[in-house]
UniProtKB/Swiss-Prot annotation:
PANTHER family: RADICAL SAM CORE DOMAIN-CONTAINING PROTEIN (PTHR43432:SF6), SLR0285 PROTEIN (PTHR43432)
Keyword set includes Transmembrane: no
InterPro entries named among the record's database cross-references: MJ0683-like, rSAM
Name of the protein: Uncharacterized protein MJ0683
GO molecular-function term, one example from the UniProt record: metal ion binding
C-alpha cells in the first residue's frame, strides 16, 4: 500500500453523473484519484481538474455521498467507479462504498469493478440487490513488471481468488482483462485460470492515449512491446489476432474495448 497519500475531503453536489460508458447510464465516483498508481491508467486525465500532484499521490473523498444517495431509486445501470477504485485501501477506514451500498435503493442496477479483494467484505450487501454484477480487473503482471506499473494494487492471485469466492456465493461476477499489451499479457492463460468460476468477460486493449509516461516506460524496458503498439498496422494485427483467439473460447463475452 502507498502510505504517502494526500487525502482531500469534499462535499459532493450530486451522487451520480451521466456516462458514455457502454451499457451504463450513470457513474458513481465516491473517490477520485487512486492509491494504486498504475502507470497505464486512463483516469490520469482527472489531474486536469484536480491538481493535487502526481497521479497516485492523492485521493479525493466525497464524504457526503452516502447521504446524497440514500433511498434514491435510480433507473438505469450504474457503474462504480469510472475514475477510481471503490475498494482502494482507504475504503477500510472511510467505508464510503459500504455505506453507499447500504443506503441506495436495492432496485438499482449496479455494476462494480475493482482490483481489490476487499470487495468480499460487502458480499452480504450484494445479495440484497435485485440486479448486481461485480468484476475484478485481471492481468498477469507479476514480479518487477507489476512492481513497476501496478506498484500498490493487490496481487492477481488475490483478485482471482476473490472472483472465485464471489461465484461460489452466488454473486454474478466478471473478469475484466486489462490492459492487454503485446508480450506482457497472456489472455489465453488468464481465461484458463478463471473460466470455471467466471460468469462473463470484458477485454480491454491498452489505451495509447492514457499515459506518455507508460509509453516511454515500454520503450525503455520492453522495446518489442513498444514496437508493436507504436506501429498502427502492427498493433491492429495484434488486436485482431487476440480477438480471433478469444472468440474461439467457450466463454460469455460482454465487451471488447479497443481505443
Amino acid at each position: 500500500m502507498n502510505s504517502k497519500i494526500e487525502i482531500i475531503k469534499i462535499k459532493a453536489k450530486k451522487p451520480i453523473n451521466p456516462t458514455k460508458i457502454p451499457g451504463a447510464k450513470y457513474v458513481i465516483n465516491q473517490y477520485i484519484g487512486c492509491q494504486y498508481a498504475c502507470k497505464y491508467c486512463y483516469a490520469r486525465f482527472m489531474c486536469k481538474w484536480y491538481n493535487y500532484g502526481k497521479w497516485g499521490s492523492w485521493v479525493v473523498v466525497k464524504e457526503n455521498l452516502p447521504d446524497l444517495i440514500k433511498n434514491k431509486h435510480i433507473k438505469g445501470k450504474i457503474y462504480m467507479s469510472s475514475v477510481s477504485d471503490a475498494y482502494r485501501p482507504i475504503e477500510k477506514d472511510f467505508k464510503l462504498t459500504r455505506n453507499i451500498l447500504k443506503n441506495i435503493d436495492k432496485r438499482a442496477e449496479l455494476s462494480i469493478l475493482t482490483k481489490s479483494d476487499l470487495v468480499l467484505r460487502d458480499m452480504d450487501l450484494f445479495k440484497k440487490f435485485s440486479s448486481i454484477e461485480v468484476g475484478l480487473t485481471i492481468n498477469n503482471f507479476e514480479g518487477n513488471l507489476k512492481k513497476d506499473i501496478e506498484p500498490f494494487s493487490p496481487s492477481n492471485e488475490k483478485r482471482i481468488d476473490a472472483l472465485k469466492t464471489l461465484y461460489e456465493n452466488g454473486i454474478k461476477n466478471y473478469a475484466f482483462i486489462s490492459p492487454i499489451i503485446p508480450d506482457l499479457i497472456d489472455v489465453e492463460y488468464i481465461i484458463g485460470e478463471t473460466k470455471p468460476f467466471t460468469n462473463f468477460y470484458y477485454f480491454e486493449f491498452l489505451n495509447l492515449k492514457a499515459s506518455r509516461e507508460f509509453k516511454h516506460y515500454l520503450e525503455q524496458n520492453y522495446p518489442e512491446s513498444y514496437e508493436i503498439i507504436s506501429n498502427k498496422t502492427a498493433f491492429k494485427r495484434y488486436i485482431d489476432e487476440v480477438i480471433n483467439t478469444i472468440k474461439k473460447k467457450d466463454i460469455a463475452i460482454k465487451g471488447i474495448c479497443v481505443h
